[in-house]
Amino acid sequence: MANLLFALAAYLIGSVSFAVVVSKLMGLPDPHSYGSGNPGATNVLRTGNKKAAILTLIGDALKGWLAVWLAARFGPAHGLNDTGLAMVALAVFLGHLFPVFHRFAGGKGVATAAGILLAIDPILGLGTLATWLIIAFFFRYSSLAALVAAIFAPFFHVLMNGVDVMAGAIFVISVLLIARHRQNIAKLLAGKESRIGEKKKV
């Protein structure tokens, strides 16, 4: 029961879309209505409002980190086990992808996944972030960097901790993240994907 309750709480935390919340508070258009239509920091940046994009990035990452950290810190005393913690990690990610508060129209989950990984293990999170930065620096594609980081994240965890239930959760998160980038994959293959720094009209 504890596992389910913590997972439900994590899903609700993940369902808070900071792209939508920040945009509304700052008088910007709904991120679903322009650019890629994705409620995430990259799309919010297309408005030209860097502050809004940064706040969105921080908020989405923080909710992933907070849900897992709180569960790991206080959950065991209430009956949460390793399987439950893995469920929490997956649930907060699913909340971001399919938010109940925003008609289940969520983002792609890159920032939230980063927060989750940092909470599971800071070294794991930083290693995955370093992978993103390296690919982004050399190729200038945010989506490609996210895809490569998603592929490596489960392997990093297994190398550090072996095959466990959390490895399974991270693998599922990675698969879902890659699936959410299917349009980006098509654009990358067609040579039509936007590079980092390019602006699109809102």
UniProtKB/Swiss-Prot annotation:
Pathway field of the UniProt record reads:
Lipid metabolism; phospholipid metabolism
User: Could you tell me the keywords of this UniProt record?
Assistant: Cell inner membrane, Cell membrane, Lipid biosynthesis, Lipid metabolism, Membrane, Phospholipid biosynthesis, Phospholipid metabolism, Transferase, Transmembrane, Transmembrane helix
Which superkingdom is the protein from? Bacteria
Query: Under the GO molecular function aspect, what terms does this record hold?
Result: acyl-phosphate glycerol-3-phosphate acyltransferase activity
**Biological process terms in GO annotation:** phospholipid biosynthetic process
Q: What class of enzyme is it?
A: transferase
Which cellular component terms (GO) are annotated to the entry?
plasma membrane
Q: Which InterPro entries match?
A: G3P_acylTferase_PlsY
Q: Which residues cross the membrane?
A: 2-22, 82-102, 119-139, 158-178
How does the protein associate with the membrane? Answer: Multi-pass membrane protein
Q: SMART domains, from UniProt?
A: G3P_acyltransf
NCBIfam families found in the cross-reference section: glycerol-3-phosphate 1-O-acyltransferase PlsY
Subunit structure comment from the entry: Probably interacts with PlsX.
What does it catalyze?
an acyl phosphate + sn-glycerol 3-phosphate = a 1-acyl-sn-glycero-3-phosphate + phosphate
- Give the family from UniProt: Belongs to the PlsY family.
Q: Which gene encodes it?
A: plsY
Name used for this protein in its record:
Glycerol-3-phosphate acyltransferase
Q: What is the lineage of its organism?
A: Bacteria, Pseudomonadati, Pseudomonadota, Betaproteobacteria, Burkholderiales
Where does the record say this protein resides?
A: Cell inner membrane
Entry function: Catalyzes the transfer of an acyl group from acyl-phosphate (acyl-PO(4)) to glycerol-3-phosphate (G3P) to form lysophosphatidic acid (LPA). This enzyme utilizes acyl-phosphate as fatty acyl donor, but not acyl-CoA or acyl-ACP.
- A Pfam family annotated for this chain is G3P_acyltransf
Q: What is its EC number?
A: 2.3.1.275
